Amino acid sequence: MIGRLRGIIIEKQPPLVLIEVGGVGYEVHMPMTCFYELPEAGQEAIVFTHFVVREDAQLLYGFNNKQERTLFKELIKTNGVGPKLALAILSGMSAQQFVNAVEREEVGALVKLPGIGKKTAERLIVEMKDRFKGLHGDLFTPAADLVLTSPASPATNDAEQEAVAALVALGYKPQEASRMVSKIARPDASSETLIREALRAAL
């Protein structure tokens, strides 16, 4: 089991980051809310990971702290929620915002996330609220919504295409992802900025 990585960021291609540890490159899938806080390529990062084994793949999911990882592990225990959907949920809102939405039973906020219908949102609220009772000491407590900010990477010529590709990887349909990016696109924006603003606008 790989629970933590400390190494140099080689490449950032949202929502994937390549981290080199001891000469080995680990490809890690990260929620965008965690991805935004990563340092730039060439710098050292510490990522808490959860290892998922499937018939066709072995995947690493990464987080900035143990609390975010704990929430991810609880999410994938929910009926109908796999790692991909859990990643999309924690990309659309921060871990703290998700906890707040569940505690306040905000179905409307959850259904705006990709892959979440009303029934899934209601099931998440029922199941997760019950689990939070025993997790608050190790997870989060209801609080004001947090807005994550971090320095954006310099804009690239294909920033919009990268943003669309990342949104598709998170579960949005290609046409929907293109529409989301085109609504907030501007020439000087990096792909990370476009993704963050597109997800924020969707909520």
From Swiss-Prot:
Residues 143-154 are annotated as: Flexible linker. InterPro entries: DNA_helicase_Holl-junc_RuvA_I, Hlx-hairpin-Hlx_DNA-bd_motif, NA-bd_OB-fold, RuvA, RuvA_2-like, RuvA_C, RuvA_C_sf. SMART domains: HhH1. It comes from the Bacteria. Its main location: cytoplasm. Keywords: Cytoplasm, DNA damage, DNA recombination, DNA repair, DNA-binding, SOS response. Residues 155-203 are annotated as: Domain III. Residues 65-142 are annotated as: Domain II. One of its GO terms (molecular function) is four-way junction helicase activity. CDD domains: UBA_RuvA_C. One of its GO terms (cellular component) is cytoplasm. HAMAP family: DNA_HJ_migration_RuvA (MF_00031). Belongs to the RuvA family. The RuvA-RuvB-RuvC complex processes Holliday junction (HJ) DNA during genetic recombination and DNA repair, while the RuvA-RuvB complex plays an important role in the rescue of blocked DNA replication forks via replication fork reversal (RFR). RuvA specifically binds to HJ cruciform DNA, conferring on it an open structure. The RuvB hexamer acts as an ATP-dependent pump, pulling dsDNA into and through the RuvAB complex. HJ branch migration allows RuvC to scan DNA until it finds its consensus sequence, where it cleaves and resolves the cruciform DNA. Has three domains with a flexible linker between the domains II and III and assumes an 'L' shape. Domain III is highly mobile and contacts RuvB. Homotetramer. Forms an RuvA(8)-RuvB(12)-Holliday junction (HJ) complex. HJ DNA is sandwiched between 2 RuvA tetramers; dsDNA enters through RuvA and exits via RuvB. An RuvB hexamer assembles on each DNA strand where it exits the tetramer. Each RuvB hexamer is contacted by two RuvA subunits (via domain III) on 2 adjacent RuvB subunits; this complex drives branch migration. In the full resolvosome a probable DNA-RuvA(4)-RuvB(12)-RuvC(2) complex forms which resolves the HJ. This is Holliday junction branch migration complex subunit RuvA.
